[in-house]
Each structure stands twice: as structure tokens, then as C-alpha cells.
Amino acid sequence: MPLELELCPGRWVGGQHPCFIIAEIGQNHQGDLDVAKRMIRMAKECGADCAKFQKSELEFKFNRKALERPYTSKHSWGKTYGEHKRHLEFSHDQYRELQRYAEEVGIFFTASGMDEMAVEFLHELNVPFFKVGSGDTNNFPYLEKTAKKGRPMVISSGMQSMDTMKQVYQIVKPLNPNFCFLQCTSAYPLQPEDVNLRVISEYQKLFPDIPIGYSGHETGIAISVAAVALGAKVLERHITLDKTWKGSDHSASLEPGELAELVRSVRLVERALGSPTKQLLPCEMACNEKLGKSVVAKVKIPEGTILTMDMLTVKVGEPKGYPPEDIFNLVGKKVLVTVEEDDTIMEELVDNHGKKIKS
């Protein structure tokens, strides 16, 4: 069983704990604080466990030329990439306001620290856990510094190889045992054939002492629900108030109705996963009573007869007697009284104390 860890105060993940559902707001708030608050409330009302943003200190995430390059996409909020990103970036004070709002609403609040200085700010903000975006998963100095902060870590694996993920594990594990990996493919929207849910199972084999989850960028909810059925203990999906809004993430995001349905479906699947123990359940008793079969006499069997297979058959009997799986054990035993043809073979009719007699 994968290791359990306390990802947020009082909220454990892994083992038999419910899947932790992260509503990734990212920058789908359009740079509007009120929209961001509406999305936090929406995440809570739909049943998500956590509302998550993306925090960057732009001069530490991008070099000058990257910020100055022209940005002419239909999704652009400025003439340069820097202007575009600044429009979408909340200040430290605004982050504190959003954190307070999430606390009022009653949902956990965190963000991906998109650079080392952003991680420093989030650490100061006292977020419950750090989310490592796929773009920083192979940034080993960043990983080391983040791990040393001591907070739980959720690490996405988009754009990475299995060899890289093994290195990530080896770097983080000695510094901070409280982390998990998310299978992720960095494409928006993600096509089903590129999801590779089987990586979840491979991660579970290679890293059996950490929880494994899934970060999805596909459309719809079916694939994410399947990830939970495969054992994903953390599930992250982007959310939006309107898929048609400006921004490259909106088309791969879930609107309120979809998020609510995702949460309902995940919780339903968790109930359906149930127990690995196979046994006759109380809910099956009525069906078993009506349709369950018993061993019956194929012919009239006189008192003292040693039972052979050609004397026995299996039918729905009234009353119930030996279940079909006991039929081979009855062969070689003696009947204590005469059993009429088509009667149920009852326990009191058979000598169960003596040894089986070879016929």
C-alpha cells in the first residue's frame, strides 16, 4: 500500500483515503481578482478539496528577451509576453487576500511556485503544500531548495522521461519523504491516445512508498475518473467559468457543471472500488436465496448407499442444501436415510463423520 501523507492539515492522501481533488485555477482568472474569488467559491461548491493558482516572479522565471518578445496570439493580454504575463499575475497582497477568501469559503489554498522566488513567497504565505509544475520537475536545484522547505510536495511529470522521474525521486526522497508524483502529459487539450494512464501503474511499481496521482488536460471527465479507478490518490484538473474565454487553458478546463460531475463520479468510483475480499455479501442474500443452486438427487438413493457422481446433479432447490461447490466432497459418503429423486441433499441426510468410502 502506498505511503500515506498529510497533504493539508487533517487531510491525508494515499492508502484508503479519498482522492484529493485539486481545482487548478491557474491563470484562468483573466487577471481579475473578483473572477478569481468566484472560481474559488465554485471549486468549493463543486466539492473540490483545494483551489490552486500559479505564482511567478516574472524576472526570475523569464530572462529579459523572453519577456520582451512580441506576443501576437489571440490569447494575448499585451503586445509582449511580459505585458501578457504581468496582466495575469497577482501581487503578493492579492495572494494574501485570495488565501483569506479561500479560508472563509472553507477550501484549501495553494499555488505552483513557478520559480525559486515564488516558492519563497509561498513558503512565507504558509501554503499547506507545494505544487511543482511539469516545467520545473527536471529543475534539480529548484527541487532541492523546495524539498528542503519541509512542506509536502505534489510533483507533476509532464514532458519528463521515466529516467528523469527516477532521478527526481532520488533527489527529493532523502530531503523530504512527503511527496507524490502525478502522471501528466503537457498538451492542451490532451488527446486520449497521449494520456498514458498505464504510467500510473508503472509509477506504483517503481515508487511503492509514495502516493501516485494524475494531472489531466483532456476534455471531459471520463479519463480522470478512470485514473482514480487505477489508483490515483491526487487528481488535478484545470477549471474555468467559461471555456470560450481568452486564454489557452480554457478549452482544456472544466466548467462548474463538469467539475461537480467529476467530483460525484470520483466519489462514486471510490465507493465501487470497495474491498479486495471476495465473499457472499449481505446484499446478495436475497438473490442467492432465490437463484442459488444446491446439490439434489438425480435418482432415488436408498438408505446406506455410498454416493457417486451419477447419483447427483445441481438445481435451484427447495429447501437449500449443499452448495454446488461441495458436490465432489459428497462423493464417497453414505446417506443415512433414503433420498427421493429430485430431493435436495441436506446435511443431516449424509454421514459427515465417517471417512469417504471409495466406490
Swiss-Prot record:
It is an enzyme of class 2 (transferase). Residues 294-353 form the AFP-like domain. Keywords: Acetylation, Disease variant, Dwarfism, Intellectual disability, Phosphoprotein, Transferase. One of its GO terms (molecular function) is N-acetylneuraminate synthase activity. The modification N6-acetyllysine is found at K61, K74, K79, K290. The keyword Endoplasmic reticulum does not apply. Disulfide bonds: none annotated. GO terms for cellular component: cytoplasm; cytosol; extracellular exosome. Catalyzes the condensation of phosphoenolpyruvate (PEP) and N-acetylmannosamine 6-phosphate (ManNAc-6-P) to synthesize N-acetylneuraminate-9-phosphate (Neu5Ac-9-P). Also catalyzes the condensation of PEP and D-mannose 6-phosphate (Man-6-P) to produce 3-deoxy-D-glycero-beta-D-galacto-non-2-ulopyranosonate 9-phosphate (KDN-9-P). Neu5Ac-9-P and KDN-9-P are the phosphorylated forms of sialic acids N-acetylneuraminic acid (Neu5Ac) and deaminoneuraminic acid (KDN), respectively. Required for brain and skeletal development. PANTHER family: N-ACETYLNEURAMINATE SYNTHASE (PTHR42966), SIALIC ACID SYNTHASE (PTHR42966:SF1). It is linked to Spondyloepimetaphyseal dysplasia, Genevieve type: An autosomal recessive disorder characterized by global developmental delay with infantile onset, intellectual disability, skeletal dysplasia, and short stature. Skeletal findings include flat vertebral bodies with irregular vertebral plates, irregular and flared metaphyses with vertical striations, small and irregular epiphyses, premature carpal ossification and small carpal bones. This is N-acetylneuraminate-9-phosphate synthase. It comes from Homo sapiens (Human). The lineage of its organism: Eukaryota, Metazoa, Chordata, Craniata, Vertebrata.
